[in-house]
Amino acid sequence: MFAVVRMRGTVDVHRKIKETLKMLRLHKRYHCVVIPDTPSYRGMLQVVKDYVAYGEINAETLALLLRLRGRLTGNRKLTDEYVKEKTGYETIEEFAKAVVEGKASLKDLPDLKPVFRLHPPRKGIKNIKWHYPRGNLGYHGEEINRLLYKMR
C-alpha cells in the first residue's frame, strides 16, 4: 500500500500531470490518498513524482490517519463503533492492520471518503523543489510515515 500526498499547488501544471492528479483524487495541496501497489498506479506515480510525496505506509500510520482524518459522508468522524458495525473488526487499528496486509480494503467501509485532508507539516518541510532526501518530493519509502505523522 502506498500513501500519496500532494505537495505542490495547482498553478502552471502540465495538462497530463493535472489529469493524473485528478485520477488520483489529489485536487488540492496536502490531500492524501492510500492506493494499492499495482503497475498502473506505479505508472501514475511516475508521471506525478514532481508534485507528490509517496511511499509505503505502515499499519500504525494508517490507523492514525483513519482515526484523526478519516471522514464519512456528511463530514462525520470515523469511529470504532462504525468500523465494528460495517466490517467486523473491533477497532480502527485492527482494520488498518488488515488493510496493510491485504486482507481488507478501504472500500469495505461504505461511506468513507477516499481523500484525507491533512494539516501542513508541523515544523515545516525541507523543500518542495527538490526530491527526497534533499526535499520532500518523490519516493520516500518508509520515511513517508514520518512525514504523515508531521501532517496528522
UniProtKB/Swiss-Prot annotation:
One Gene Ontology molecular-function label: RNA binding
Superkingdom of origin organism: Archaea
Gene Ontology CC entries for this record: cytosolic large ribosomal subunit
Keywords: Ribonucleoprotein, Ribosomal protein
Biological processes, Gene Ontology terms: maturation of LSU-rRNA from tricistronic rRNA transcript (SSU-rRNA, 5.8S rRNA, LSU-rRNA); translation
Database matches in Gene3D superfamilies: 1.10.15.30, Ribosomal protein L30, ferredoxin-like fold domain (3.30.1390.20)
S-S bonds: none
InterPro entries membership: Ribo_uL30_ferredoxin-like_sf, Ribosomal_uL30, Ribosomal_uL30_arc, Ribosomal_uL30_CS, Ribosomal_uL30_euk_arc, Ribosomal_uL30_ferredoxin-like
Entries under HAMAP family matching the protein: Ribosomal_uL30_A
Subunit composition and interactions: Part of the 50S ribosomal subunit.
Name under which the protein is recorded: Large ribosomal subunit protein uL30
